[in-house]
């Protein structure tokens, strides 16, 4: 039987709408659960040079239980002033933590923390470069200087910082490793990049929190990852990949029999300051995952399937409705189920971003609603840009931070 163009169109769009529906259901269910449990209520608002916190819900003051907590910021020196600002915030918490900065030999900036300088001639056995090289050297340095099972390392990028209660929780957390949820600091510097990052907030509140609480880090990210020092030293960071070190480390932690959990505290990140930086950042993430897929597949094939499904279908939440519009005007041929799926997908897509707005600045809610589709196109364009203009595999894109 020969299919007509309209029938083929109906089949394809119905498939796209149906494939996104499980994501929509999961996202909605998990975010509603967050509202009901208020499990991410430690959602401090970042303000300029300090963090304003609600009354603490984590009663953990035993800083002398034998456990040591250190914070490590890895930087290439491009954002030295930002790192200094983040270190001053961490110091203001007045906690018995040690602060370290892993930096390159060419970085002559003197940071207000203990410095670990990666020698210019240092080479990883698996030829890891850039951040992976620095992290791997750092793990060896910590081992050499006696940091072991009693020490927990909180890793930060050179634009991220965690709250005081996040660090307090580490002193008693019952896992070998873990991670919290993302929030924004310095939002609004670039409107579309800020609104685009609302997706990351909701992603963390739903899938990150859920999978981490189950001990399966299926959506891990680099900011705020906490690892016991001896575990990190055993696994290392020398993967020889372009990036995706956060995902790989999380999978290897579980693969090697260690535990991974959810830390009920915020990690503050800064949105990119321009469209150019936003696209360069997303391109780096996309290609890091694509190039690392064969490596990750050997560790956890389920993660690869999940990531591919999310990347391939995640964009269709907002286009499913538009894909079906021609059929509505030409001839109403969709089943009631597909119509219901399409409506639910669209509502969920708006709700997903509104949750991020709720956790950042409620006054932006109407603006987010009006700009929902332009922002979605802004984000979706990163995939097209990445495929058309792949990065230089021997060069690591660096963006300006604040």
How would you label these PLM feature ranges?
Residues 251-268:
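Catalytic donor-sugar/metal-binding loop of nucleotide-sugar-dependent glycosyltransferases
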Residues 121-142, 170-235, 239-240, 279, ...:
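Long helical/loop segments within the catalytic core of UDP-sugar-dependent glycosyltransferases
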Residues 153:
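Short aromatic/hydrophobic "clamp" motif used to bind/position activated sugar donors
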Residues 85-97:
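Short, acidic, metal-binding catalytic loop of nucleotide-sugar glycosyltransferases
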Residues 243-249:
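Acidic donor-binding loop at a coil-to-helix junction in glycosyltransferase catalytic cores
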